Swiss-Prot record:
Taxonomic placement: Bacteria, Pseudomonadati, Pseudomonadota, Alphaproteobacteria, Hyphomonadales
Family that this chain belongs to: Belongs to the Maf family.
Gene3D superfamilies, per the entry: 3.90.950.10
Source taxon at top rank: Bacteria
Protein species of origin: Hyphomonas neptunium (strain ATCC 15444)
Protein name: Nucleoside triphosphate pyrophosphatase
Keyword Hydrolase attached: yes
């Protein structure tokens, strides 16, 4: 019998990535106060990549304490230098994100942790680097207006799988990690655990 797989998230995009790759996983909300946890980590001056990893672990542990099998927790944070970006609260904040990122390179700290029986057993951190072209104010206004509230669900106020591709001059790292799930290393681990065929 194969191990059950649960995604400690209600993220439609992460579930869709897993399903498209042939991984059946239930999505369960981890019920974590992410904002409070992030504020504590930032007050302690943890590097952005460590913040993402700890939040991914917390999500997986919370759900794993109540669910059998393997529980996948994930988190993605955008780092511009040492500064962490959160999902924009509204469209004006999305515009400000884009203004700050314009003409610069940033990293998407994309962490996943797998827990079993309430304890972490596997971790992976992907760090795709994206370079945004210089954006004009007119472009930012038009882009945000046309994409609308969809931009509020991403840390960078862009969706690479759509018109957000127009924002970049260079991308280093794998596509799945940019979308929020380092899928290839995850699939490797699931094969090791015999969740997927080898």
């Amino acid at each position: 019998m194969s191990l059950a797989v649960t995604l400690a998230s209600t993220s439609k995009s992460r579930r869709a990535l897993l399903a498209a790759a042939g991984v059946e996983a239930d999505g369960v909300a981890p019920n974590v106060d992410e904002e409070s946890f992030r504020n504590t980590m930032r007050a302690n001056k943890l590097p952005v990549r460590e913040q993402a990893m700890q939040l991914a672990e917390l999500k997986a542990m919370r759900v794993s304490a109540k669910r059998p099998g393997l529980v996948i927790g994930g988190d993605q944070m955008l780092a511009l230098g040492d500064e962490a970006f959160d999902k924009p609260a509204d469209l004006e904040a999305a515009k400000n994100h884009l203004r700050q990122l314009s003409g610069k390179s940033h990293t998407l700290e994309t962490a996943i942790v797998i827990c079993e029986d309430g304890a972490p057993i596997w971790r992976h951190l992907a760090r795709p680097k994206l370079t945004m072209r210089p954006l004009t104010e007119d472009f930012i206004e038009t882009y945000v207006s046309s994409c609308g509230d969809a931009l509020l669900s991403t840390v960078g106020a862009y969706q690479l799988e759509g018109p957000g591709a127009q924002l970049f001059t260079r991308i280093e790292g794998d596509y799945f990690s940019i979308l929020g799930l380092p899928l290839l290393p995850l699939l490797d681990y699931l094969r090791i655990r015999k969740v997927l065929p080898t």
